[in-house]
Amino acid sequence: FDCPILPMRYESAELCKISINMFLVSSVSTTNMLAEVCEAIGADWREIAPALRLDRRIGPHAYLTPGLGIGGGNLTRDLVSVQALASAHGTDAGIVDAWLSNSEHRRDWALRTLRAHGVERPGIVLGLWGLAYKEHTQFTKNSPAMALIAALPGVAVRAYDPAVADAETPGSVTRVASALAAARGADLLATMTPWPEFASVNAEEL
C-alpha cells in the first residue's frame, strides 16, 4: 500500500482505530451542538464553518456539517467499547456519555420539530426524504429516519430513498419512486438523509 506504515504494539493498533472515530465523534457532536445554538439565537452555522476551516488546528477537511446525531454502527460501537474499557480500568469516560446523550438529542430533532407542527393530528400525511443513516449508503442501522418512523406509529408516512431496499422499510410506510412523489399530498415533509438530489428539487415543484 502506498501509505505511511506506523509500527506499534497490538493494543495501540486496536485503540488507534477507535481513537480516530472518537475524534470524528467529537467533531460531529460539537458541530451539532453549535448548529442548534445557531438556530436558537439567529446565527447561521454555514457562515461560521468556513472560518473554522481556516484555523490550522481544525483544518479544511474537518467534519463541520450538522446532522441528526451519530448514525450507522461503527462509531456507536466504538463509543460503547470505550465506555466498557473505562469502566473496567477505572478511567473517566464521561465525555463519551455526553456524546451519546447529545447524539440521541440530535436524532430526535426532527421528531420535536414535527410534533411542534402537529404531525400527530388525525389524517396527517408525512413525507420523508431519505431512510439511510447517511447519504451514499443503503444501510439503515441507527438511522434517524427509522427512529422517527418508530416514534410516530399512527402517522401515515410516504418515503423515498434512492438506495435503501423496500425490505428494510417498516410495513406501515408507503415507499414511492421519487422525492416529488413523497412530497405529493404530504402535509409535512422532512429531509432525513442529505442525498444530493434533494438539494436540486425546485421548491416550486413541491
Descriptions of predicted regions:
Residues 1-206:
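Structural/interface elements that position substrates and couple domains in central-metabolism enzymes
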